[in-house]
Amino acid sequence: MKNTDIRSFDLTQRTIFGLLSQTLFGAAYTPEPDVDWTEVYQESENQAVRLQTFANHHLIPDIPDELREKIRRYLAAAMLRNARIHGEHTYVHTLLTQNGIAYSVLKGAGSACYYPDPLTRAMGDVDFFVSREDFDRALALFAREGFTASGQDHICHVVLRKKPIHLEMHFEPAGVPDGEVGEKILSYLSDLRACAVPLKSRLTTCMRPCDFHHGLIMLMHLQHHLLAEGIGLRHLCDWAVFVNHFRPNEFRETFEERLKAVGLWRLARLLSLSAALYIGLPEQDWMRDDPEDGEIAGQLMVDIVAGGNFGKKNRQRAYEGLFISNRGKDGVGNNRLKEGFGALNRITRAKCPFTQRVPILLPVGWVAVLLGYLFRNHKRNQTKGHVSAADAYKKSSARQQLYRKLGLYEPEL
């Protein structure tokens, strides 16, 4: 069974893989000679895994003193921030439950609880789900609490802000595709709130999804960002520790049949295999189903690392994604020029609302959007660097070919 040799990754990347395997799964690991620890620190930041990478920094004598002090300060500040965000989960829980609104968090503390130490998971904002029937009532409730709502035209959530709290209230998880597969996924999620599980720890009290719902939500979220800007190692770590908490064959029994029906089982297998090959997740037989799976899992890992967390390492990837897919909603099999043209139309309608009211003016909107792109690119040339649409189109080809191998939202009958 052919795998992408770990030596295909550079020393900095291999070091991060080894440290992650040590932190997440207790694997024995000794760094190779000549590691540039400043580069490791920077790359772990790009991947949003500094906490997991340096959780055991005291066991690494080669880290320079100045960098070690920087690491200590970062770990202390990051864990304090994470503890605060766990507390915000409790705040949301208390507010909603005291007012009779059933809900479930999405990811967040629900992902952190699978880590050996939940504080080592880099936390973002608080995402949670309420039903469409309760949505307006919940919105009014947060308004009375002093939150400002924005993004009401978003496809699946509203943003709620009251400094320093940042919330995303969903009426639908991100990444649900169009068509019959999307309808089946929504049927899977119809009892999301009813099946939610209480999470009570030293850090938080909230309602989290059951294992099946959590895995499904993560897979949709992962493909949603993978096809666009990229996911980075943080998301792979979330997936790996989740898979690791199942007993042997329990994961397969829980997920295989239902995920095959919506075309996500192959993604689940190959993500798990990537984590097993490179960051220490114990491998199980269900992770491989084809002699080429090891090679595909390696290619997937190369892609994950290349993008960084939400494309932090390569801003052009988001533009490449416009030629690959509409974040998976219509699959990844379309012609890239057709995808790019579709993306231009979606962006134009969003940025120039008059084109929705008067469709004949859509070409005028195209001009406005393209002029805006040229203006922003001019400014980037002076600051962060040029983003080439032609280069994005060219590089999108290899990525699309890889993603087609994942069979996203293509049911396995």
How would you label these PLM feature ranges?
Residues 2-124, 130-413:
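Conserved NTP-donor binding/palm subdomain of two-metal-ion nucleotidyltransferases/polymerases, i.e.
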